[in-house]
Amino acid sequence: MSKIRVLSVDDSALMRQIMTEIINSHSDMEMVATAPDPLVARDLIKKFNPDVLTLDVEMPRMDGLDFLEKLMRLRPMPVVMVSSLTGKGSEVTLRALELGAIDFVTKPQLGIREGMLAYSEMIAEKVRTAARARIAAHKPMAAPTTLKAGPLLSSEKLIAIGASTGGTEAIRHVLQPLPLSSPAVIITQHMPPGFTRSFAERLNKLCQISVKEAEDGERVLPGHAYIAPGDKHMELARSGANYQIKIHDGPPVNRHRPSVDVLFHSVAKHAGRNAVGVILTGMGNDGAAGMLAMYQAGAWTIAQNEASCVVFGMPREAINMGGVSEVVDLSQVSQQMLAKISAGQAIRI
């Protein structure tokens, strides 16, 4: 089997050296070239035709985002961004994902060499996922039409969403059309600390419903979406007649924290047939067992179809496990969620 050919673009010679060491330490991939800036990278891409590009977000000669935008328009290819953990870094990284980057890795704040080498397996996994991802020429997503507002739903109803690679844009596409009368939405997206808050703030500006990073103990309200904080598990809990959010530091599940399975199992337990579950694009199997539990508890469950996924891993696993009520294109997910939950949704026999 041929190796995954990687090209790394970073203005730091140390980072280029470390990325080369990491990539070449895995037998199924090789670093074919490195570039100190996007202008040099442009020529190297033509020369080496890499399978995956790793791209530093912040560079002096040409902004990484400008380069990414041109690249995705003219020569779409899988890109993994390398970002700092600063607030600005998280905003720029989210913009990169919007422009078509597949995923990102964060640079450690101290001890770059030791930190990056400790991330070696994670970086290799992201490169492998990117090499398999579905890439299309970047077309800015049209602002979705707001769905017709139905009657304000009971606070018993709620929607639970899980996603990983490719999920930030898929979640945006699902949340933007939701009217203020929507039920509560609780979301687990695999993402490190610092990025989930920026992600929630960005969505809050784009959506009619309120979007925020979830906090432990807060009440779950209709017309609001709650995003699991990075490196914490989020569960649905009960407080009398109300739902509330529980945030905790439990061990990783399916190697993830936050884990979609943790969220979905809690929704199955506390919301049952009053919930709709949605599993979107992502690598691996996180969420499949939890979605089956939701399905068995009477919830309507939706998986994103392969054609609209960046990576079809998580939806495929959920479908194979038998816990999916229907498989729909990303463009139809919002509509189906609301249709099922408004109809009292527990219409499965």
From Swiss-Prot:
<comment type="function">
    <text>Involved in chemotaxis. Part of a chemotaxis signal transduction system that modulates chemotaxis in response to various stimuli. Catalyzes the demethylation of specific methylglutamate residues introduced into the chemoreceptors (methyl-accepting chemotaxis proteins or MCP) by CheR. Also mediates the irreversible deamidation of specific glutamine residues to glutamic acid.</text>
</comment>
<dbReference type="InterPro" id="IPR035909">
    <property type="entry name" value="CheB_C"/>
</dbReference>
<keyword id="KW-0145">Chemotaxis</keyword>
<protein>
    <recommendedName>
        <fullName>Protein-glutamate methylesterase/protein-glutamine glutaminase</fullName>
        <ecNumber>3.1.1.61</ecNumber>
        <ecNumber>3.5.1.44</ecNumber>
    </recommendedName>
</protein>
<dbReference type="GO" id="GO:0000156">
    <property type="term" value="F:phosphorelay response regulator activity"/>
</dbReference>
<feature type="domain" description="CheB-type methylesterase">
    <location>
        <begin position="152"/>
        <end position="344"/>
    </location>
</feature>
<dbReference type="InterPro" id="IPR008248">
    <property type="entry name" value="CheB-like"/>
</dbReference>
<comment type="similarity">
    <text>Belongs to the CheB family.</text>
</comment>
<feature type="active site">
    <location>
        <position position="190"/>
    </location>
</feature>
<dbReference type="GO" id="GO:0006935">
    <property type="term" value="P:chemotaxis"/>
</dbReference>
<dbReference type="InterPro" id="IPR000673">
    <property type="entry name" value="Sig_transdc_resp-reg_Me-estase"/>
</dbReference>
<keyword id="KW-0378">Hydrolase</keyword>
<dbReference type="GO" id="GO:0050568">
    <property type="term" value="F:protein-glutamine glutaminase activity"/>
</dbReference>
<feature type="modified residue" description="4-aspartylphosphate">
    <location>
        <position position="56"/>
    </location>
</feature>
<feature type="domain" description="Response regulatory">
    <location>
        <begin position="5"/>
        <end position="122"/>
    </location>
</feature>
<dbReference type="InterPro" id="IPR001789">
    <property type="entry name" value="Sig_transdc_resp-reg_receiver"/>
</dbReference>
<dbReference type="GO" id="GO:0005737">
    <property type="term" value="C:cytoplasm"/>
</dbReference>
<keyword id="KW-0963">Cytoplasm</keyword>
<feature type="active site">
    <location>
        <position position="164"/>
    </location>
</feature>
<feature type="active site">
    <location>
        <position position="286"/>
    </location>
</feature>
<keyword id="KW-0597">Phosphoprotein</keyword>
<dbReference type="InterPro" id="IPR011006">
    <property type="entry name" value="CheY-like_superfamily"/>
</dbReference>
<dbReference type="Pfam" id="PF01339">
    <property type="entry name" value="CheB_methylest"/>
</dbReference>
<dbReference type="GO" id="GO:0008984">
    <property type="term" value="F:protein-glutamate methylesterase activity"/>
</dbReference>
<dbReference type="Pfam" id="PF00072">
    <property type="entry name" value="Response_reg"/>
</dbReference>
<comment type="subunit">
    <text>Interacts with CheA.</text>
</comment>
